[in-house]
Structure formats: C-alpha cells, structure tokens
C-alpha cells in the first residue's frame, strides 16, 4: 500500500469469467516434507509393508500329502484424508499446517560494506524499541500472514481475467484472508487478532493506488486492455504483510510490468541494515527508467512515480515514519536492524505524478486527536465501534458495514472526518489515458539476514 510523499501526504493512522475452473492448490512442498500431509499409502498396513507379501506359518495337508499355506486375509488399510487447500481458498492455515512451521520467505545474506557507520543516540533508541518488538511469536506471525497472502493471491491471479468484476475479485480476496487466518471479524475485536491489514486495492490503468469497490457504486468489469494493480495486506496480531502485483491480459504492456518488477527487485536487493535510502531510491529510478513501452505506435518512456513511496511498517500501522521514494532524493535516513519495509515501486506512462480523485478508498483513525471534542451521540458510538474493531488499521466501507449493528453511519462518519478523529483516503490518479503498474514485497531486516517474507514463486 503506497505512502504519499510529504508535500501531499495525508498519512494514515500512523499510519476468464466467473465460472472459470481452477485446479485445487496443493499445500507447499515444505509443509508436506515436514509431515503436514500424514496418511498411509493404500495397500499398506501400520508397519508400512505390503500385506500381499505376508504369509502365515499355518501348514495344511492336501489329500496327496502335499503341504500348502493358507493366506491370511489382508488387513483393510486405513485411509487418512489428506488436507488440501480448496479453490477458492477457505481452509484455515492452522488446519492446513497442523502445528507445523509456516514457510520462510526468501532469506538473503547482507552485503557487508565498510562504511564506518555511526548511529546517533536517537537512532539507537529507535533500534532497541524495534528489536524489543520482535518477540517469540514475531516470525511465526509474519510467516503465517505471508503464507495467507501467497495462497489468496494465487487464487486471485487465477480469476483476474477479462470479464471478472472488481466487486467479485475484492470479495474473494477479503473472504479468503478471513478464512485462512481463521478470523471472520464479526465479533468485537476479532479483526484485530488477524485478517485484512487495509482495504483491498484494485486499481485500473491511470488509477495508481487507493481504489476499492464500494456498495452502491456501479460495478467495474476487467477488460482485455486494462492494467490491473492488486494490492492487499494480511496481518496476524498486528504483524502486517503488504504485497502487490500487476496483471495485464494484453502483452503490449509486458515491458511496463517488467520495468516495475525489476525496479522493485532492485530495491529489495539494495535494502539492508545501514543501507542509505537515497542510494536505494536512485538505484530504483535508474532501473525503472531504462525501460520503454510501445503503445499505439508510439515509444513511451516509463517513468518512476514521483509523489508516492515505499514505507516502513509498524505494528498495526501500515505507514511508519520512513519513506523509500522511487526517484533520486536527498535524505540522511538509513535502514536499521529490526525495520520492516514495504518495498514497492510504481511506473507510469503518464506524468508520473498522482493526485486525489473523487470517492473514498477507506478510513483510518487519527490517534493524535482527542475524542472529547465529540458531542454527537451517533459519532461517539461509531468511534467506539471503529476503535474496538479496527484500532489503527485502515478499513473500507464494506468492512464496516458487515459488522453487526452498524447502520446509517454516514452522518456520524462525516462528523468524525470533519473533526479530524478519522481520516478519509481518496483514490490517487495520473492523467487519463496513462497506465501504471505496481509490484511490492515486505522485507524484514533481521540481525543476520533480510527475509523477503512475502516472496513467492509468482513474483
């Protein structure tokens, strides 16, 4: 989920067709190898041997005196059902993995650079706070969230074909995340245990970020010539995995997608403890803008979007206080041990500068505002519901509307937004007729290595 640049930044609360047949997805090989799929082969008994080879020692004499051996009846083998993910994915990961460890992300050793770097006292304190936050369940929670993301997006990629509606795609992603985390989010506080980290973003063509379907609006259908960016987040106990990809049915956009994917991978390669953010930004832009795309007979340079950035992630907060631009910048900021970053890039065939559009993508709580300013009872009640169910997580209208008892909330929400207690987020767009692509991964800067936690076989 992109973070807007400071000059325009309104930071969050810290913040085929529908009947396409999809093959059932098997669990990861690592899970099967670790004993996840436990079952006996047909025709084997409990000792693992084939009963056909077993004979009894009982001798029977025939009339001619010859001996023959009587076969013992075969034991009927017990078949244990193999746990597999369904399509669409709805089996909770806790059931699928059955206490087995969740898969690691991509582990990358650091490149040791002798910069003779010194951290200031403030940086040391910030680093210590980040390390303290990495408790015993840190990696378990992060790897679970990442595996949920991989399995849900695998299905999303399979159905994101021309003819699918954005509403269906968003609902499949939302429902998949809830099912696999095992938290439907209907009971008070359940969505804070695990689930969606922010509204599922489905942005077409010149819409760069922060668009999601809302109830009551005209549904949008994916077309052959569309460029679709799919950006969604999964959290487990506030550990947020933020990852995004782009799909395009028309191969004319292949170079656009390749440029952005290469730029994101460059950012991931450069990321690490003590890495200078200005160096990372410059490297990203150099790779991104080395590509061109031919559209309607014209060769168009691909530009790195200037006013949206990658960002660090805090617990229950999708946007922290560090940003990673995609263009050359001046900053003394460095990445630090314990940091978690969403390394993402956006490439555009337009002006590569995004502006607010009409509509609402989502809402987020502003913790810096005192709720004592509220006097309207409906607004107070709505704020209580938001705090209890979303906390500092950004949420969409459809997430709020599915909660029991939430009705006719629009006046209360308007009051909360006008008072500054809740911030609203608009879609971000480039010029009409342009096309934007996005790729994104979450990386953990662990003490001895970096782990690209959301990496999969797809991207």
From Swiss-Prot:
Annotated spans, Disordered: 1-87
EC number(s) on file: 3.4.11.18
Compositionally biased intervals (Basic residues): 67-79
InterPro entries found in the cross-reference section: Creatinase/aminopeptidase-like, Met_Aminopeptidase_Type2, Pept_M24, Pept_M24_MAP, Pept_M24A_MAP2, Pept_M24A_MAP2_BS, WH-like_DNA-bd_sf, WH_DNA-bd_sf
EC category name: hydrolase
Composition skew (Basic and acidic residues), residue ranges: 1-12, 55-66
Cofactor comment text: Binds 2 divalent metal cations per subunit. Has a high-affinity and a low affinity metal-binding site. The true nature of the physiological cofactor is under debate. The enzyme is active with cobalt, zinc, manganese or divalent iron ions. Most likely, methionine aminopeptidases function as mononuclear Fe(2+)-metalloproteases under physiological conditions, and the catalytically relevant metal-binding site has been assigned to the histidine-containing high-affinity site.
GO cellular component, one term: cytoplasm
Reactions catalysed: Release of N-terminal amino acids, preferentially methionine, from peptides and arylamides
One Pfam short name: Peptidase_M24
Ranges of biased composition (kind: Acidic residues): 43-54
Primary subcellular site in the record, as a coarse category: cytoplasm
Residue sites binding a divalent metal cation 2 per the record: 242, 311, 344, 440
An example Gene Ontology molecular-function term: metalloaminopeptidase activity
Cellular compartments annotated: Cytoplasm
Cofactor(s) the protein needs: Co(2+); Zn(2+); Mn(2+); Fe(2+)
GO biological process: proteolysis
Amino-acid positions noted as binding substrate in the UniProt annotation, renumbered to this chain: 210, 319
Hydrolase keyword on record: yes
Record's keyword terms, sorted: Aminopeptidase, Cytoplasm, Hydrolase, Metal-binding, Protease
Domain of life: Eukaryota
Binding site for a divalent metal cation 1: 231, 242, 440
Function: Cotranslationally removes the N-terminal methionine from nascent proteins. The N-terminal methionine is often cleaved when the second residue in the primary sequence is small and uncharged (Met-Ala-, Cys, Gly, Pro, Ser, Thr, or Val).
Protein family (similarity comment): Belongs to the peptidase M24A family. Methionine aminopeptidase eukaryotic type 2 subfamily.
Name of this chain's protein: Methionine aminopeptidase 2-2
